[in-house]
A protein has these predicted regions:
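C-terminal catalytic "cap/lid" subdomain
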Residues: 1-236
């Protein structure tokens, strides 16, 4: 039995690299698809947003001399590549999946709108929402917050390479301690980098809770969905 009926799963592009330095690791992709299938089999309605940092980051491109708008557009295209890859992996695992894009690029994906996304999820498809918000200067964290609010998700699950939110970076500070749950006000007060400020404030204002957890440990996604205390819960 799943704790949540409809979720927004946010995946980082970097996590798709696995052990590689760039691009997509097929083993990691298959592991993610298998984990998503596990919760799909529980009857959960699933929307997904994936970053593009394993291929290109608009902000880092701007720091290297790219026009920021063009750099962000390249980043949006990177998220589409990742979304198509995950869609293919899900189909191979026996799960119906559909890619929606925030900018028109048929036949690569359908143009996104809330009602189409919900219709597809209610029909049992995993919906992967790509190209961010379709606008420059917005991160995929902000895009995932927006989509989670739009599709009326019960929770956003932020799958990362760490097992939750800490008082400091545990890789740099051995005294850092993990939060099992924390309020949005405390996140903002402490300046914790759960997501960028815009994304965090959107979730707070629209009462969308976030669970930050380690997606790279196989089985964790299902454990979260079954109510186990994995990761950190952020709430009002």
């Amino acid at each position: 039995m799943a704790t949540y009926k409809r979720i927004l799963l946010k995946l980082s592009g970097e996590s798709l690299m696995g052990e590689k330095q760039y691009g997509i690791d097929e083993k990691r992709l298959a592991e993610y698809a298998a984990q998503i299938k596990d919760i799909h089999d529980l009857g959960v309605q699933i929307g997904i947003v994936i970053g593009g940092g394993n291929i290109f980051r608009g902000l880092s491109g701007a720091n290297k001399g790219f026009d920021r708008v063009k750099g962000d557009q390249m980043g949006m295209l990177a998220t589409v590549i990742n979304s198509l890859a995950l869609s293919s992996a899900l189909v191979a695992a026996g799960v119906k999946a559909r890619v929606l894009t925030a900018v028109r690029m048929e036949p690569i994906g359908e143009f996104y709108n809330k009602w189409r996304a919900i219709e597809c999820m209610e029909a049992g498809e995993v919906v992967i929402m790509s190209a961010g918000t379709g606008n420059p200067f917005f991160t995929t964290d902000t895009g995932s917050s927006l989509r989670g609010i739009e599709i009326e998700a019960d929770v956003m699950l932020k799958g990362t390479r760490v097992d939750g939110i800490y008082t400091a970076d545990p890789e740099k500070d051995p005294t850092a301690t993990k939060f099992h749950d924390i309020t949005y006000d405390e996140v903002l007060k402490r300046g914790l980098k759960v997501m960028d400020l815009t994304a965090t404030c959107m979730c707070k204002e629209n009462n969308l809770p976030i669970i930050v957890f380690d997606m790279d440990t196989v089985g964790n996604l299902k454990k979260v969905m079954q109510g186990e205390e994995i990761g950190t819960l952020v709430h009002n």
